[in-house]
Regions:
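Key DNA-contact positions within bacterial/archaeal DNA-binding proteins
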Residues: 61, 113-114
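Short, polar N-cap/turn motifs at the start of nucleic acid-interacting alpha helices
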Residues: 102, 112-113
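Membrane-proximal linker segments that couple transmembrane helices to downstream signaling/catalytic modules
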Residues: 2-94, 98, 102-103, 119-122, ...
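The short coil/loop that forms the "turn" connecting the two helices of the helix-turn-helix
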Residues: 58, 110-111
Length: 155
Protein backbone atom coordinates (compact mmCIF):
# COMPACT_ATOMS: atom_id res chain seq x y z
CA UNK A 1 0.00 0.00 0.00
CA UNK A 2 2.83 2.41 0.81
CA UNK A 3 4.29 1.92 -2.66
CA UNK A 4 0.94 2.84 -4.18
CA UNK A 5 0.81 6.08 -2.20
CA UNK A 6 4.31 7.07 -3.31
CA UNK A 7 3.51 6.40 -6.96
CA UNK A 8 0.21 8.25 -6.64
CA UNK A 9 1.91 11.24 -5.01
CA UNK A 10 4.59 11.40 -7.72
CA UNK A 11 1.93 11.26 -10.43
CA UNK A 12 -0.03 14.02 -8.71
CA UNK A 13 3.09 16.20 -8.48
CA UNK A 14 3.90 15.53 -12.14
CA UNK A 15 0.40 16.67 -13.15
CA UNK A 16 0.81 19.84 -11.07
CA UNK A 17 4.19 20.57 -12.65
CA UNK A 18 2.65 20.46 -16.12
CA UNK A 19 -0.17 22.71 -14.96
CA UNK A 20 2.14 25.57 -13.92
CA UNK A 21 5.39 26.59 -15.64
CA UNK A 22 8.53 26.62 -13.43
CA UNK A 23 8.86 30.41 -13.76
CA UNK A 24 5.22 30.99 -12.83
CA UNK A 25 5.59 28.45 -10.01
CA UNK A 26 8.47 30.46 -8.49
CA UNK A 27 6.63 33.77 -8.88
CA UNK A 28 3.45 32.36 -7.37
CA UNK A 29 5.41 30.79 -4.50
CA UNK A 30 6.87 34.20 -3.59
CA UNK A 31 3.46 35.87 -3.83
CA UNK A 32 1.85 33.22 -1.64
CA UNK A 33 4.57 33.59 0.99
CA UNK A 34 4.25 37.38 0.91
CA UNK A 35 0.51 37.28 1.48
CA UNK A 36 0.29 34.40 3.94
CA UNK A 37 3.45 35.07 5.97
CA UNK A 38 4.45 38.72 5.56
CA UNK A 39 0.90 40.06 5.60
CA UNK A 40 0.00 37.46 8.25
CA UNK A 41 -3.17 36.35 6.49
CA UNK A 42 -2.81 33.01 8.29
CA UNK A 43 -4.29 34.79 11.32
CA UNK A 44 -7.57 35.32 9.47
CA UNK A 45 -9.88 32.37 10.19
CA UNK A 46 -11.77 33.00 6.97
CA UNK A 47 -8.80 33.41 4.62
CA UNK A 48 -9.29 30.51 2.25
CA UNK A 49 -7.42 29.29 -0.82
CA UNK A 50 -10.25 30.84 -2.82
CA UNK A 51 -9.68 34.27 -1.23
CA UNK A 52 -5.91 33.97 -1.76
CA UNK A 53 -6.49 33.08 -5.41
CA UNK A 54 -8.75 36.13 -5.82
CA UNK A 55 -6.14 38.39 -4.18
CA UNK A 56 -3.42 37.05 -6.49
CA UNK A 57 -5.57 37.14 -9.62
CA UNK A 58 -5.46 33.40 -10.22
CA UNK A 59 -7.56 30.35 -9.37
CA UNK A 60 -7.54 27.80 -6.56
CA UNK A 61 -6.18 25.08 -8.81
CA UNK A 62 -2.96 27.07 -9.35
CA UNK A 63 -2.73 27.92 -5.66
CA UNK A 64 -3.16 24.26 -4.78
CA UNK A 65 -0.57 23.20 -7.37
CA UNK A 66 2.05 25.66 -6.13
CA UNK A 67 1.51 24.87 -2.45
CA UNK A 68 1.60 21.12 -3.09
CA UNK A 69 4.73 21.20 -5.26
CA UNK A 70 6.72 23.92 -3.48
CA UNK A 71 5.79 23.23 0.13
CA UNK A 72 4.86 19.53 -0.08
CA UNK A 73 1.56 19.96 1.76
CA UNK A 74 -1.98 21.09 1.09
CA UNK A 75 -3.19 24.67 1.62
CA UNK A 76 -4.73 24.03 5.04
CA UNK A 77 -1.59 22.35 6.38
CA UNK A 78 0.50 25.18 4.93
CA UNK A 79 -1.52 27.87 6.70
CA UNK A 80 -1.73 25.88 9.93
CA UNK A 81 2.08 25.54 9.96
CA UNK A 82 2.42 29.31 10.42
CA UNK A 83 -0.40 29.41 12.94
CA UNK A 84 1.33 26.74 15.03
CA UNK A 85 4.69 28.53 14.81
CA UNK A 86 3.12 31.71 16.14
CA UNK A 87 1.21 29.79 18.80
CA UNK A 88 4.48 28.22 19.97
CA UNK A 89 6.00 31.67 20.48
CA UNK A 90 2.91 32.89 22.36
CA UNK A 91 2.78 29.79 24.56
CA UNK A 92 6.28 30.39 25.95
CA UNK A 93 6.07 34.17 26.21
CA UNK A 94 5.48 35.04 29.86
CA UNK A 95 3.44 38.08 28.85
CA UNK A 96 0.77 35.67 27.61
CA UNK A 97 0.85 33.09 30.40
CA UNK A 98 -2.60 34.10 31.59
CA UNK A 99 -4.23 33.29 28.26
CA UNK A 100 -6.48 30.27 27.91
CA UNK A 101 -5.83 27.92 24.99
CA UNK A 102 -9.02 29.18 23.32
CA UNK A 103 -7.56 32.68 23.35
CA UNK A 104 -4.23 31.53 21.89
CA UNK A 105 -6.15 29.56 19.26
CA UNK A 106 -8.15 32.66 18.35
CA UNK A 107 -5.07 34.92 18.22
CA UNK A 108 -3.33 32.74 15.63
CA UNK A 109 -6.35 32.15 13.39
CA UNK A 110 -7.90 28.82 14.29
CA UNK A 111 -11.68 28.61 14.13
CA UNK A 112 -11.90 26.70 17.42
CA UNK A 113 -9.85 25.09 20.16
CA UNK A 114 -10.41 21.58 18.81
CA UNK A 115 -8.86 22.33 15.41
CA UNK A 116 -6.00 24.15 17.18
CA UNK A 117 -5.29 21.14 19.39
CA UNK A 118 -5.55 18.68 16.48
CA UNK A 119 -3.23 20.72 14.23
CA UNK A 120 -0.76 21.39 17.04
CA UNK A 121 -0.62 17.72 17.99
CA UNK A 122 -0.23 16.66 14.36
CA UNK A 123 2.73 19.01 13.89
CA UNK A 124 4.39 18.80 17.32
CA UNK A 125 3.30 15.38 18.62
CA UNK A 126 2.15 16.99 21.88
CA UNK A 127 -0.67 19.25 22.99
CA UNK A 128 -0.20 23.03 23.25
CA UNK A 129 -0.43 22.75 27.04
CA UNK A 130 2.24 20.03 27.14
CA UNK A 131 4.45 22.16 24.90
CA UNK A 132 4.06 25.21 27.16
CA UNK A 133 4.85 23.23 30.31
CA UNK A 134 7.84 21.51 28.71
CA UNK A 135 9.34 24.76 27.41
CA UNK A 136 8.81 26.68 30.63
CA UNK A 137 10.38 23.84 32.63
CA UNK A 138 13.43 23.79 30.34
CA UNK A 139 13.84 27.58 30.25
CA UNK A 140 12.36 28.95 33.49
CA UNK A 141 13.85 32.46 33.31
CA UNK A 142 13.74 33.05 29.56
CA UNK A 143 10.91 34.74 27.74
CA UNK A 144 10.26 37.17 30.55
CA UNK A 145 8.50 40.28 29.32
CA UNK A 146 11.01 42.96 28.40
CA UNK A 147 10.89 46.05 30.63
CA UNK A 148 9.24 49.07 29.13
CA UNK A 149 11.36 52.11 28.23
CA UNK A 150 9.99 53.96 31.27
CA UNK A 151 11.10 51.20 33.64
CA UNK A 152 14.50 50.87 31.96
CA UNK A 153 15.22 54.64 32.32
CA UNK A 154 14.47 54.61 36.07
CA UNK A 155 16.99 51.80 36.73
Amino acid sequence: MAKYNIVEKKQKEAVYRTLVSPKMMDEMKEKILRVIVMEKKYKDKNYSAKKLAEDLGTNTRYISAVVNVCFHMNYTSFVNKFRIEEAMAILVDRRYQGLRMEEVSDMVGFANRQSFYASFYKQMNMTPREYRLQQLAQHPLERVAKPSKKTAKKS
